[in-house]
């Protein structure tokens, strides 16, 4: 079994923007200066602008998209997973040495194979019906 800790970035810096521009230019085989407008938009909107205050929240949302892909991919490979949100990010950050970094623990996911001795693994799963959960309007 493995415990995967997914991290979110707390802020976006000019160095992050430069890295994105360089990577984009390289991938697209274009001159980086052709992306100056894009780089300026990132600076004005996401680094210096009011949206800089919500980057951490946005980054957390992006982590959950990655988590969804992790859960789906693992299921396709027959690997059991359990997403864990009820943990102490501060303690995980301390253990992982992230306290002074620009990254923060966001969600944890246990991955592995269930024990054949697990008496709960074969019990019927309790789920609400679609009618209980979905309202059509």
Task: For every predicted segment, state its role.
Residues 1-137:
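Acidic, surface-exposed loops and disordered segments
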């Amino acid at each position: 079994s493995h415990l995967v800790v997914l991290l979110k970035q707390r802020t976006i810096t000019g160095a992050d923007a430069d890295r994105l521009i360089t990577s984009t230019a390289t991938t697209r085989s274009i001159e980086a200066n052709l992306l100056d407008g894009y780089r300026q938009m990132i600076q004005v909107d996401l680094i210096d602008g009011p949206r800089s205050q919500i980057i951490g929240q946005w980054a957390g949302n992006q982590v959950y998209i990655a988590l969804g892909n992790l859960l789906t991919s693992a299921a396709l490979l027959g690997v059991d997973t359990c997403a864990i949100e009820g943990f102490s990010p501060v303690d995980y950050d301390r253990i992982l040495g992230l306290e002074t970094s620009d990254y923060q623990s966001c969600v944890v996911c246990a991955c592995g194979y269930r024990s054949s001795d697990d008496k709960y693994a074969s019990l019927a799963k309790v789920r609400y019906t679609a009618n209980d959960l979905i309202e059509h309007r």
